[in-house]
């Protein structure tokens, strides 16, 4: 059985594909998740994260932009952007502890990003105000 960390990793891949112009990726999401052996509750979790992130993408991007110090949003690496979007969605819209979300995002950035990605992702997500919760 897949873990939530593996589900998040798959969601980052889906968000990356979406960002690269594959806006129809949702049609294939279940098949892709099953290929990665993400099923049942973890699959539901992954789809909720993906769908929620896409549904709130404009708001999420604006929130990220507020916390970029001396960075332009368009200069963020594609994988880092996907990780930040997922992390921001979870911090703002889920009941999961911020520290868990940030830790998961940092671990994802170690896998998908460059040497500077973990520190960058940590800094941006840590700057999000904890009172940002939205319904």
Swiss-Prot record:
S-adenosyl-L-methionine is among the record's keywords: no
GO terms under cellular component: cytosol
Classification of source organism: Bacteria, Pseudomonadati, Campylobacterota, Epsilonproteobacteria, Campylobacterales
Source superkingdom: Bacteria
Position of the signal peptide: none
HAMAP family in the cross-refs: NusB (MF_00073)
InterPro entries cross-referenced by the UniProt entry: NusB-like_sf, NusB_fam, NusB_RsmB_TIM44
Role played: Involved in transcription antitermination. Required for transcription of ribosomal RNA (rRNA) genes. Binds specifically to the boxA antiterminator sequence of the ribosomal RNA (rrn) operons.
Similarity remark: Belongs to the NusB family.
This protein's name: Transcription antitermination protein NusB
Keywords, comma-separated and alphabetical: RNA-binding, Transcription, Transcription antitermination, Transcription regulation
Annotated gene: nusB
Keyword Lyase: no
GO biological process, alphabetically ordered: DNA-templated transcription termination; transcription antitermination
Gene Ontology MF annotations: RNA binding
